[in-house]
Amino acid sequence: MLFERARQVFPGGVNSPARALKHLPSSLVARAASGPYLYTDRGRLVDYCMAFGAIILGHAHPRVKRAVEEQLERGWIYALLTEQEVEFAEAIRRHMPSVEKMRIVNTGTEATMNAIRLARGYTKRDVIIKFDGNFHGSHDYVLVKAGSGAATWGIPTSAGVPQDVVKLTVVAPYNDVDAFLKAVKEVGDRLAAVIAEPVAGNYGLIIPDAEFLKALREETKRVGALLIFDEVITGFRLGLGGAQGRFGIRPDLTTLGKAVGGGFPIGIFGGRAEVMDLVAPSGPVYNAGTYNAHPVSVTAGLAVLKELETGEPFRTADEAAERLAKGIEDIAGRLGFDVVVKKIASMFQFYFKKGDVKTPQDVRESNEKMYLKLHEIALRHGVYLTPSQFEVNFTSAAHTREVVEETLAALEKAFQQLKTEIG
């Protein structure tokens, strides 16, 4: 069994905790992927994890594949400037005007780590505020009350992070203006930056009140701190302008990843030119990397952006998520389940609970065991939902009406079976 072999060479048998599927005896084994489908050791599955949001056009999209193949013919790494990376950056700036200059790195973790370092270098202050349940990667600055896999596995604050580092990270409740203002007051003139997911996508799906995001912008500006929007998930998924475009909030710095790379490793941090000009070699805040602006990744990303600029991928993906959200709500209601469904653009998640979901505490109060049981049953019916209530389901441009109907028919059977099994 491949998973048993994997356990001999990888901690827990995987190379990222979210892949371990804690409620199942083994991880899924991928064989291939195309359009909305994953081909695995459990057969063909309709995919709603979509590489945790990294795929927005659909798996193995022909335009992206063709662009990457053409790049591979020319070579795959030079450690020199390329035309593609400039064109890619210009396209990002065109759609996200707040990103006046940027540095292209390799992961979302690198992007947020460098954005925080830059904010500290610019402000000459050391404390940051993050929010309960927001996930900004796996570096020491932010592994305090984190979401995503850290929440799934019950280790939101990682071992191995020095207390001297933890002291520089203040955690405030998400979507709570009064608590945020109190945290800013307590930190005082040591506050370098506030980093936030403008839509929380790593603790399930939490859509904040507009007043909360407005308060982040106004208060950071008032005290001379920088506002960092972590749009690794929402960037180029909630539209070409990301969450900041949707909500009309202009941050000082933005981090990007996932969808903007078309499924290839990428991370970006960027923002106001006067801040970004502090990054080496034009300034004293150091960042470097052999694989920065990797030719294959930026080529794939440019192909994705050109496709997204037509608008059609967003329309298809958003419509699919809307139909799925309404369909799940209808199925659950008819079968007597208390289920809350949250949806924005091509992101959705549902929770077994009464009442709304507006904070991480609301997510914690939902029935995680019920979600995991449904996930397991749905797999048997050919549907791969995101494997934790602390993650998000994603649709893509490949999730057509026919695929959605196929999914809802399978989920109806899954919910019926769940009802039978729980009595």
Swiss-Prot record:
It is an enzyme of class 5 (isomerase). GO terms for cellular component: cytoplasm. It is found in: Cytoplasm. The modification N6-(pyridoxal phosphate)lysine is found at K258. Its cofactor is pyridoxal 5'-phosphate. Its main location: cytoplasm. Disulfide bonds: none annotated. This is Glutamate-1-semialdehyde 2,1-aminomutase.
